[in-house]
Curated annotation (Swiss-Prot):
<dbReference type="InterPro" id="IPR002303">
    <property type="entry name" value="Valyl-tRNA_ligase"/>
</dbReference>
<dbReference type="InterPro" id="IPR001412">
    <property type="entry name" value="aa-tRNA-synth_I_CS"/>
</dbReference>
<keyword id="KW-0175">Coiled coil</keyword>
<comment type="subunit">
    <text>Monomer.</text>
</comment>
<feature type="short sequence motif" description="'KMSKS' region">
    <location>
        <begin position="526"/>
        <end position="530"/>
    </location>
</feature>
<keyword id="KW-0436">Ligase</keyword>
<dbReference type="GO" id="GO:0004832">
    <property type="term" value="F:valine-tRNA ligase activity"/>
</dbReference>
<dbReference type="InterPro" id="IPR009008">
    <property type="entry name" value="Val/Leu/Ile-tRNA-synth_edit"/>
</dbReference>
<dbReference type="GO" id="GO:0006438">
    <property type="term" value="P:valyl-tRNA aminoacylation"/>
</dbReference>
<comment type="function">
    <text>Catalyzes the attachment of valine to tRNA(Val). As ValRS can inadvertently accommodate and process structurally similar amino acids such as threonine, to avoid such errors, it has a 'posttransfer' editing activity that hydrolyzes mischarged Thr-tRNA(Val) in a tRNA-dependent manner.</text>
</comment>
<protein>
    <recommendedName>
        <fullName>Valine--tRNA ligase</fullName>
        <ecNumber>6.1.1.9</ecNumber>
    </recommendedName>
</protein>
<feature type="binding site">
    <location>
        <position position="529"/>
    </location>
    <ligand>
        <name>ATP</name>
    </ligand>
</feature>
<keyword id="KW-0030">Aminoacyl-tRNA synthetase</keyword>
<comment type="similarity">
    <text>Belongs to the class-I aminoacyl-tRNA synthetase family. ValS type 1 subfamily.</text>
</comment>
<dbReference type="GO" id="GO:0005524">
    <property type="term" value="F:ATP binding"/>
</dbReference>
<feature type="coiled-coil region">
    <location>
        <begin position="810"/>
        <end position="845"/>
    </location>
</feature>
<keyword id="KW-0963">Cytoplasm</keyword>
Amino acid sequence: MDNKNISTTYNPKEFEERLYSNWQEKKYFTPVIDKSKKPYTIIMPPPNITGKLHLGHALDNTLQDMLIRFKRMQGYCTLWLPGQDHASIATEVKVENELLKEGLYKKEMGREAFLEKVWEWTDEYRERIREQLKKMGCSADFTREAFTMDENLSKAVRHVFVKLYKEGLIYQGNRITNWCPKCQTALSDAEIEYEEKEGNFWHIKYPVVGSEEFLEIATTRPETLLGDSAVAVNPSDERYAHLVGKMLKLPLTDREIPVIADDYVDVEFGTGAVKITPAHDPNDFEVGKRHNLPQIRVMDDSGVINHLGGKYKGLDRYEARKQMVADLEELGLLVKIKPHTHNVGTHDRCGTVVEPIISKQWYVKMQSLADPAIEVVRNKGTKFVPERFEKTYFNWMENIQDWCISRQLWWGHRIPVFYCKDCGEIMVELEDPTKCCKCGSENIEQDKDVLDTWFSSALWPFSTLGWPDRTDDLEFFYPTSTLVTGYDIIFFWVARMIFSGIHNMGETPFDTVLIHGIIRDAQGRKMSKSLGNGVDPLEVIDEYGADALRFMLVTGNAPGNDIRYIPERVEAARNFANKIWNASRFVMMNLDRELMDKYKDCQEYSLADQWILSRTNSLIKEVTENMEKYELGIALQKVHDFLWTEFCDYYIELVKPVLYGDDEKAKGVVFNVLYTVLNTGLKLLHPVMPFITEEIYTHLSTETESITIATWPTYDEALNNEKAEKDMTFIMEAIRSLRNLRAEMNVPPSRKAKVMAYASEEAKDAFINGGAYLEKLASASEVTFLDNKDNLDNNLVSVVVKGGELFLPLLDLVDREKELERLNKEKTKLEGEILRVEKKLSNERFVSKAPEAVVNEERAKGVKYKEMLEAVLERIEALQ
């Protein structure tokens, strides 16, 4: 501790890296299991190894770090376990694209050679992510870091797959899947981005066999007509009742298909007749099952028409569409083409339009897994913060479909299913078989597909702690405490972790799910590569420091709500850090440790001392309660307001006369108060601004070697001083009001003036005891107290405050004639501006043609000018 030897300026580059290295060296983030302490565990949502971290990661990890640092200081045995996700398809696409730059093709390389390249990528990007998290100040235990493809996590994946298979919950079946024709794999819903695009409805005639009649259908995908198995109408639709059971000639083919009746059809939508293509549409698939229709798949894995497509065989789906529409028109079967805006799903990694296609995949039966996961949330075994996101969770879980877990990729956990090529036996065991368990043949091969990335991610809370082995970490730290994540993956990840935890561990994996929103740009747009509005958190850290970025991400952040990234707010955060630095340096440069020790038990406090100590105590209670309720943004705002305004702007300024004076005892008392308040403030600020608080604390405090392991302040009801807080509230309002009054009258702070105060009974003590504070902070030459307001000089201007009324003599402050002249000029100018705005807004052409934002801006100007004019008129009246 060396309170004098601290840098004169706040420069985070000087200490952030040094401090983090010291934290790691001292193993502050690596918990040793201590059963005398309560565990508090957060398992970090694993970022994908596909590139650098973005602002969303910075927000997610800042919130987690706040909670971990808070609980660590509260004395919990805290574990924040970091890691990364192998991100199967995302990583495979990235590596493929990199290899293409070298002229290398995945399929030509072969599986093993390609996977070697992926592991090289993995090692590089895991290290990058690790370093980025450290730069953000994340107090995670990197000695326990996990990766979804680690040996033990792969072992956990194998155990769960085998368990589910033997329980009859994993099966292989033909169902509709989201298919990427470019990557040639099934996709999860999370890997699809939907965008509104202009398209068409093609209205096509389907002739009724043996009749002159036809049925008109409308479709956005005419190329799938080749796989139609029926046309459906609603059973209540009288227009088509006579056609139900009849056969239709399927255009462009030599097949006939039936007209069926099904409640799925919306009478009001389109023509009320719907082509049913069970192999190419999820809704049609369900209709087809109900009516036992054939599933005719007319596209191959690359989106090209297959051998069932007749003359269109070998054409890409869009080329086939073009040719088929032309042929339909030539045959007189194309009724019309109607423009139509609809949502089109594309693969988020390669941008290819996704094709719903029937394919043979591995699935998990979900109903029996979902039911207990619904109950645990309903019974508050796991709580969502905010609670409204329970509806999102229930909505998905109560309408859950079986989960497609196979992917036609190379990178990932290979499906542990083995086939005997001689007798067809299927083997699913914990160890790879060497021969067929049925016929003894050694001619066996493993399923070529890999598991959906979310399969391994679903096991993250317990696989990272050593499961399926009963490790000490698993016994002590599971179930975990809080999961912090975005609302966009409640379905894909949160729900799957809950049912996986219950099914494999017998209990929910976490007590609380803290949901945050996404980060948008200043205009409220989602950040994306296409918009070019993304922000690299490391660039922000390089310019402003990690603390400023963290502060900006948390202030104003309410659970579940999106936040906007506004560069000026990061600058404001850095200004706050700078103010804390300068105030702390001022305190430390003036502290006399000997006098502190000499008078540490002296409690001859001034009103300001009593007030700031009481406010500090109240702040401890409020901030602790906010943190416990996950109101992290509110907690931070309170600490900010206290340190900036109450401590820096008021208390430090009020005690400067004591610091510069000769009263040794008064100095000793103030030194102790300054130390106590600053030390406490640093601790309350530490969870969100770890670097600056550590650097100041190590120069200031003698408690512990690091604020990281310091004790969180505790509230002491005995330290409450309501009277001091109330009295200082009167004084501070008086100071603010006097400053505002002087500013309105253009009086410089250097010009002192007498203040006369008429105080109510409850405020008398405050003004008597705090008169010196008005002199110090409100430029009062002296303060006198009035018993009544009778016979007051007309040459006074007054302001009403809570607790009384304050009077200033005009002659002491302004040249009345000059000020009236200035105000009248201002009045004329404002009247002109108001006239200009009103004229503009009365112009109908301007209001109708100008952008709405411009019109609103003019209206706002008009309101502002009128308010300013009103204030000027009041001031003129006062001077006259």
